Amino acid sequence: MSKFSFNIHHQHKKARSGIIVTAHGEMRTPAFMPVGTRGTVKAMLPESVAETGADILLGNTYHLMLQPTAERIVQLGGLHKFMNWDKPILTDSGGFQVMSLSKLCKITEEGVSFSSHINGDKYMLTPERSTEIQYLLGSTITMAFDECTPYPATFEEAKTSMQLTTRWANRSRNTFVKREGYAQFGIIQGSVYEELREQSAKDLVELDFDGYAIGGLAVGEGQELMFKVLDYAPDFLPQNKPRYLMGVGKPADIIGAVSRGIDMFDCVIPTRSGRNGQAFTKYGTVNIRNSKYADDNKPLEHDCLCPACRNYSKAYLHHLVRIGEILGSMLMTWHNLTYFQNLMSRIRAYIKLGKDFDFDS
């Protein structure tokens, strides 16, 4: 079994491209991770996700602990076997979903107590329990438990939240079972305050995580402020470890973040947009519901090799989406995921050539 490692092969200014080696295979960076929240990428077969070029996908601890439960998944052979995906899986810690989806959520030093959004059952999620669940799932990359600082937050609110995340990170690290080829990432917080981001990074680097995520962005602060934070936050992290920007997935945001030193991304945008009839292309987005596509016999993108573009016209996709056929969601999602993997491939090629990005979609 391979050791977990990150090898930077090319660098252009702050942008890096390379390979992350894991127990479940290699992933090329910069990488975009499709979101498979409940053990599935919506409207896609796992084999189809691999065909789009994805090297890794994301699963969600909160949703999987509720249904079908981590204990059931481990009895069935782990998440990889359960969903027939043999490549790397990163699982988030569950904290963000607990705080955003659950009613009567209460945050204490111990962890977060909450009621299930499904049936109202009460649960307690702690750094130890979150790490244990991710171990049971067999996650290739486990995320430390954190509090995603709401935006906007005052300096003092952000400081208190960041310090709690640091204490939780310590407990997560102490609970993590080290195995060859598996990894645990810490999450730095601090909202939009440089001093807090620097302190958070310093504290977490001392815990020697295998990689680091920048959390608490794309929560309403806007691109300009997000880029301002990314102008300095990645520089506080080790050069030789992966950097993951959580929940960011607009093409222009990805391109801007890569140019500031980020290696990994995840977002529901390509899948959610696909189900809602929006396609991403190199020439901008296409709302396939628009009546102007009813008689358009051309593909979404003439040089895209996804099944939607190889085999079907915009008129057919328009028809499927307008009448609510499942095939419409499948084809639009497949196209969007292919577009995002093509975008990452383009980004990696530009870094290898030492070229500035001259595109934003």
UniProtKB/Swiss-Prot annotation:
PANTHER family the UniProt entry points to: QUEUINE TRNA-RIBOSYLTRANSFERASE
Pfam families per record: TGT
Keyword Glycoprotein set for record: no
Protein name: Queuine tRNA-ribosyltransferase
Keywords for the protein's UniProt record, in alphabetical order: Glycosyltransferase, Metal-binding, Queuosine biosynthesis, Transferase, tRNA processing, Zinc
Record's catalysed reaction(s): 7-aminomethyl-7-carbaguanine + guanosine(34) in tRNA = 7-aminomethyl-7-carbaguanosine(34) in tRNA + guanine
RNA binding, as annotated region: 247-253, 271-275
Known EC number: 2.4.2.29
Family, per entry: Belongs to the queuine tRNA-ribosyltransferase family.
InterPro entries: ArchSynthase1/Queuine_TRR (IPR050076), TGT (IPR004803), TGT-like_sf (IPR036511), tRNA_ribo_trans-like (IPR002616)
Co-factor remark: Binds 1 zinc ion per subunit.
Pathway(s) the chain acts in: tRNA modification; tRNA-queuosine biosynthesis
